[in-house]
């Protein structure tokens, strides 16, 4: 048996993303959403495709929000979801590793686990969030759909690169280009503006394909060296004027530079099975008693 065949499969779930996806399809109906999600995870548990499953819940991050007030400020705050999410987590923690951190984003926890575990296992992230596509350069896979407990739709390298095609349909060339390209473009869904307003897409692609330095950890000194490789004087001047914006966007968007010390932020979360709470949302006991 080959080394690739020997590798265990590990699933990391972006629970907040899955909750929002299922809730939107069910037009905000909490009982239907909880039942559907429990049905999904019961199937995943029974099918045993993955040797280990991590369910990641969001904490209340401070640093990013404190430093940049617009970060994710365009998202609707829905306090009503926290009670059903806790009820849902009370079931999932009986069967899976539910993890999170009080003052860190779920995305950071997912990225930390994925990049470390991918060194010895085949790691799959269940989410529809494009933020995780930057991790594909490390062999991490993103699953966007399950069918009968099995991973059904896995984003290919070609599909990932096509998500960042230009108006002529030209995709990015390599997976490592995704992060710096997004840094320059920004992400309106997270309230992150373009790092260099008005910069042409062709100039951004030139920078990430020809000038960006990928073999060293990102820093402002590295950025200055990258800018030094740009031959066009006008483009170089634009980059110099926007150094602070580029640094800001990189800090907000990068999931590849999380230090080993981040591990101390991750906690295993376990709730006693909330049967009373479940009875308000779920009619079938077999959906939470597997």
Question: Which ranges hold each PLM region?
Answer:
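Domain-level signal for Mg2+-assisted phosphodiester chemistry and nucleotide/NA-binding surfaces
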Residues: 2-94
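Extended two-metal-dependent nuclease catalytic cores across DNA- and RNA-processing enzymes
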Residues: 2-4, 27, 50, 73-281, ...
């Amino acid at each position: 048996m080959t080394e690739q065949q020997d590798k265990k499969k590990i699933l990391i779930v972006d629970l907040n993303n899955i909750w929002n996806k299922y809730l939107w399809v069910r037009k905000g109906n909490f009982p239907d959403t909880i039942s559907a999600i429990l049905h999904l995870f019961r199937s995943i548990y029974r099918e045993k495709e993955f040797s280990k499953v991590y369910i990641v819940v969001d904490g209340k991050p401070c640093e990013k929000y404190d430093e940049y007030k617009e970060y994710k400020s365009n998202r609707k705050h829905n306090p009503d979801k926290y009670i059903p999410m806790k009820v849902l987590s009370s079931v999932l923690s009986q069967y899976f590793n539910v993890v999170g951190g009080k003052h860190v984003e779920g995305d950071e926890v997912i990225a930390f686990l994925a990049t470390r575990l991918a060194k010895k296992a085949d790691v799959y992230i269940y989410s529809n969030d494009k933020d995780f596509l930057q991790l594909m350069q490390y062999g991490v896979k993103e699953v966007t759909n399950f069918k009968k407990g099995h991973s059904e739709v896995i984003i290919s390298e070609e599909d990932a690169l096509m998500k960042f095609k230009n108006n002529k349909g030209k995709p990015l060339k390599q997976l490592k280009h995704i992060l710096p390209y997004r840094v320059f473009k920004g992400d309106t869904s997270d309230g992150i503006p373009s790092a260099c307003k008005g910069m042409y897409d062709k100039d951004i692609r030139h920078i990430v394909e020809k000038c960006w330095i990928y073999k060293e950890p990102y820093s402002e000194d590295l950025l200055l060296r990258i800018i030094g490789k740009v031959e066009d004087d006008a483009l170089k001047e634009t980059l110099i004027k926007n150094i602070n914006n580029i640094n800001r966007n990189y800090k907000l968007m990068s999931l590849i530079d999380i230090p080993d010390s981040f591990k101390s932020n991750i906690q295993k979360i376990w709730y006693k099975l909330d049967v009373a709470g479940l009875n308000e949302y779920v009619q079938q006991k077999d959906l939470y008693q597997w």
